[in-house]
Regions:
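Short acidic, flexible loop segments centered on an aromatic residue
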Residues: 284-307
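Active-site-adjacent structural elements in enzyme catalytic domains
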Residues: 1-88, 138
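Short glycine/serine/proline-enriched coil/turn segments at secondary-structure junctions
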Residues: 4-7, 92, 111, 275, ...
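Metallocarboxypeptidase
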Residues: 71-72, 76-266
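Short structured motifs
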Residues: 265-269, 282-284
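Beta-strand secondary-structure signal
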Residues: 14, 222, 280-284, 296-298
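Short, solvent-exposed loop/linker segments at the N-terminal edge
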Residues: 271-277
């Protein structure tokens, strides 16, 4: 926002990362994007527009205790602790804790495939839904705002995942809306778009995306950033490129929080014209955003031939 201390009547969008504490690239990507917004807002018209017309919120670390533990055991990176640090009577290592992305209240504990009742499992869902302070904090933050869409970053697999966690698709028109947004996010990096089952081959329950969409009716996505070979802790030399890969998707996700008017398609009655001849032009305008548009639309048509 260009007025961060004022609650303006602008579309709101939220980005989160590091729900799983061994997935730091989500955080790095968000910090890079925030830096880009701050440093290039006066030289980049898209960024300037977003700052002036959106309220963008960032939670770069959802799981600070888990991340601090990874820093403790592997100061140079590479710690593989995934969950938070709740004492679940599984020792002091990486088996303890609750998987925060199985602790949300929508579909929590619906089966033992998408999450686990075993306190020492990597996908342990907790004793009850929203049992953990981290998920409570994210829940309350979302409820206290009017977000149009939320992006929950994870690693890895180079895919964009939308609801539902059980592999089924939302009803229309939301299903098409989600796919259209995901495909535009993937325009330049080519990430596959779909459910977790269709993209990475497994189901989840009690996850943040299903709660955000299913309980709060907010369009939500999980970007899984980084390739299988790069893993949870990609080489330092790969980090900048991976952050750059998400700039377009981060911008698009902010654009679609409001009205986002584009030329969807156009058709000429015929393309070859002799001097003085007229043609008919049919233009289809689409609002691919999540908010209504009350603006006038101007279309300027210019010739590419100076003669």
């Amino acid at each position: 926002s260009d007025n961060p201390n004022i609650d303006e009547d602008e579309p709101e969008v939220l980005y989160t990362a590091l729900t799983h504490s061994r997935e730091p690239l989500g955080m790095m990507n968000l910090i890079y994007f925030v830096q880009l917004l701050a440093e290039e807002q006066n030289s980049n018209t898209e960024l300037e527009y977003l700052i002036s017309n959106r309220e963008m919120w960032f939670i770069p670390i959802v799981n600070p205790d888990g991340y601090a533990y990874n820093e403790l055991i592997e100061p140079n990176g590479g710690g593989m602790h995934r969950k938070n640090r709740l004492n679940t009577n599984c020792g002091n290592g990486s088996n303890r804790g609750v998987d925060l992305n199985r602790n949300y209240g929508f579909g929590w504990g619906s089966n033992d495939t998408g999450s686990s009742p075993n306190p020492c499992s990597a996908t342990y869902r907790g004793d009850t839904e929203f049992s953990e302070p981290e998920t409570q904090a994210v829940r309350d933050f979302i409820i206290n705002h009017e977000f149009k869409n939320v992006l929950h970053y994870h690693c890895y697999s180079n895919v964009y995942i939308h609801p539902w966690g059980n592999g089924s698709f939302p009803e229309e028109p939301d299903s098409s809306t989600l796919v259209d947004i995901g495909r535009e996010m993937a325009r330049y990096n080519g990430y596959p778009v779909g459910t977790g089952l269709s993209t990475i081959g497994y189901t989840v329950n009690g996850d943040a995306v299903d709660w955000t969409y299913g309980d709060q009716s907010i369009i939500s996505y999980v970007p899984e950033v980084g390739s299988t070979s790069q893993g949870f802790w990609p080489p330092e030399s790969d980090v900048l490129e991976l952050c750059l890969d998400q700039v377009h998707s981060n911008k698009i996700f902010a654009f679609v929080a409001g009205s986002d008017i584009i030329i969807h398609s156009y058709e000429l009655s015929h393309e070859d014209m002799v001097p003085g001849e007229t043609v008919e032009l049919d233009v289809v305008i689409q609002n691919r955003g999540l908010s209504d548009s009350d603006a006038y639309i101007d279309i300027n048509i210019n010739t590419l031939n100076e003669f």
